[in-house]
């Protein structure tokens, strides 16, 4: 079973062998009205679906746990935090080894989030090409990020 978030903030599920057949559809509620869900992933340690609400104009971000049956998004932690992810593609994936979320923006920014506190765990160095690469000096175009053994 595969879960996805639609442009209308609905949580849908479908079978990978029949992707045109929607098995469930529930509206997602509880996300700050100024934020858009820009990434979701299941936390391997608990099986919970996490989502990131983000406002690209202000940089305000917040982690949520999304109930698969009701679509209710419950904020993790007490307040928003700031990220500089820009307005392009955003990569979001759990690292199952250290139980942290890797976030990368189309602008090359690179973060780790803490699923327990709901806040920023670390700001890592910007993504960049290695010295000597023909693209050195350009921002790498990252559309997704994935870890091995990241399943429930």
Regions found by a protein language model. Give the residues of each.
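Mid-chain, structured segments of secreted extracytoplasmic proteins
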Residues: 39-82
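Structural motif
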Residues: 8-14, 57-65, 107-114
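Conserved beta-propeller blade signature
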Residues: 1-5, 48-52, 99-104, 111
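N-terminal segment immediately downstream of the Sec signal-peptide cleavage site
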Residues: 1-38, 43-46
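A surface/extracellular/periplasmic glyco- and lipid-processing/surface-interacting theme
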Residues: 97-104, 108-144, 148-152
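Structural signature of eukaryotic scaffold interfaces centered on beta-propeller domains
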Residues: 38-47, 83-99, 137-152
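Short strand-connecting beta-turns/loops that link adjacent beta-strands
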Residues: 7, 45-46, 56-58, 97, ...
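Beta-propeller fold detector
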Residues: 21-32, 73-81, 114-135
């Amino acid at each position: 079973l595969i879960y996805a978030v639609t442009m209308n903030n609905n949580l849908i599920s479908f079978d990978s062998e029949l992707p045109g057949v929607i098995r469930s559809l529930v509206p997602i509620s509880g996300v700050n009205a100024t934020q858009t869900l820009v990434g979701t992933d299941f936390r391997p340690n608990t099986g919970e679906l996490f989502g990131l609400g983000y406002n690209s104009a202000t940089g305000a971000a917040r982690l949520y746990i999304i109930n698969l049956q009701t679509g209710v998004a419950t904020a993790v932690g007490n307040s928003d935090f700031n990220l500089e992810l820009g307005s392009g593609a955003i990569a979001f994936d759990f690292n199952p080894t250290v139980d942290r979320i890797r976030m990368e923006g189309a602008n090359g920014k690179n973060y780790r989030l803490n699923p327990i506190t709901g806040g920023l765990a670390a700001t890592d160095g910007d993504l960049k090409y290695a010295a000597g690469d023909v693209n050195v000096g350009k921002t790498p175009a990252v559309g997704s990020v994935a870890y091995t053994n990241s399943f429930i």
